[in-house]
């Protein structure tokens, strides 16, 4: 891979209600606004040569990618390592309640039945490495806010923070291969010795 284009999915039924969903088995399609955002993403990407589209296991992500790439012959690959976090006891609940809980915790603390942030970062890094090893030149990754935010900040040299800024729906971040290697090194170093 030479170029990675990253885009968050469009607004979903859960995100519109500020609810968390880390279980890909739970149906969570896009809202009408999310479908419009996905089509707008397609217009943004219209002039891009895309050799492969990577998605997660989540319906909202696949739907966004399919709408954005409608009419184009682009193969898809599922990268489950880039799924949203497993929220455990917070699954299906308020995003604000989860954020309030998680911000006060260290990177090795997890909600019951969920993942801690060092696990999440390690999983994401493995997923990004899978993409980096792909033979295709340009890969579009449609994913979730958190993996994109971690990679975006790491590309600027910043390790994960206890509270990450949300990534806007259906916008594009471009990272060249030479930007990805140091960004992944930042994430791997943090995951090996996590601290906020």
Walk through the language-model features, giving the residues of each:
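Glycine-rich phosphate-binding loop signature in dinucleotide/nucleotide-binding domains
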Residues: 46-49, 131-137
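A generic secondary-structure signal
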Residues: 43-44, 126-130
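Phosphate-handling substructures
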Residues: 14, 28-29, 70-124, 186
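Short beta-strand scaffold positions
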Residues: 55-56, 122, 142-143
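Acidic, low-complexity terminal tails and accessory targeting/binding regions
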Residues: 1-2, 44, 77-78, 85-96, ...
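Active-site-proximal alpha-helix that buttresses catalytic centers in soluble enzyme cores
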Residues: 2, 7-72, 115
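Generic beta-sheet signal
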Residues: 4, 137-145
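Active-site signature of alpha/beta-hydrolase-fold catalytic machinery across serine-
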Residues: 67, 150-154
